[in-house]
Regions:
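Alpha-helical transmembrane segments of multi-pass membrane proteins predominantly involved
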Residues: 1-219
Length: 219
């Protein structure tokens, strides 16, 4: 059976160096406080995890294509919203505080990870997907900017995206997850654009003069 074209990228990263690169990419979405990098890293992680799944487990090519389409559309919505939003996002603390937070989270995860497993996934795949989801949770908790909030929400859906493709490949669950990703991105993009709407100017009160003060009509 010929390999899916989506699996080519997964074949390149299906090794220790590739997995380490993905761990660092997920962490950088929190450390580098920039909405462009948040969107870029989020879409890259969704595409690469889908490709890894295609290379290691060979799901239906149509399922992988729907995952790619959903990730690209969601990323495009967030990117366009960030481009039209002139208000800069204030960083949530400095990078050292965020690094310490990620380090604490990593230590806690290493303590509990041997007891956590996902169906049909190896321990390395489980660790990677859960780490991506945890980085999304940190990004979501630190950000009050809609674009970065959307990136965090999309990262949180990475484990669900993979499980839907493996556990129910023919049920359309992966398509539903993709639709949910697009709706999340659309909601965050709409919120970002709504923040730029000018406030409605108050209408001046209508003053009515008493009958005694009204000017007499001119004949």
């Amino acid at each position: 059976m010929p390999a899916s074209p989506f699996a080519l990228l997964g074949d390149l990263l299906a090794n220790s160096a590739g997995v380490l690169l993905l761990w660092l990419l997920a962490a950088s979405s929190v450390l580098v406080w920039n909405w462009r990098w948040a969107v870029t890293s989020t879409v890259s992680l969704l595409l690469v995890t889908s490709s890894l799944l295609s290379a290691l487990h060979s799901p239906l090519a149509l399922v992988t294509a729907s995952q790619w389409l959903a990730a690209l559309l969601a990323g495009l919505l967030l990117w366009q919203a960030g481009s039209f939003s002139p208000i800069p996002t204030a960083p949530a603390g400095n990078w050292l505080i965020r690094l310490c937070g990620l380090g604490f989270l990593l230590a806690a995860w290493q303590a509990v990870s041997p007891s956590i497993s996902l169906p049909l996934l190896t321990q390395a795949e489980t660790d990677l997907l859960c780490w991506i989801g945890l980085c999304g949770l940190v990004l979501l908790s630190l950000s009050n900017a809609p674009v970065q909030t959307g990136s965090g929400l999309l990262l949180l859906t990475a484990p669900l995206q993979s499980l839907a493709a493996l556990l129910a490949p023919a049920s359309g669950a992966a398509v539903l997850v993709g639709m949910a990703q697009i709706l999340l991105a659309l909601a965050c993009a709409g919120r970002a654009l709504a923040q730029q709407l000018p406030p409605a100017s108050p209408q001046p009160p209508h003053l009515s003069l008493p009958a005694t003060q009204r000017p007499a009509p001119r004949w």
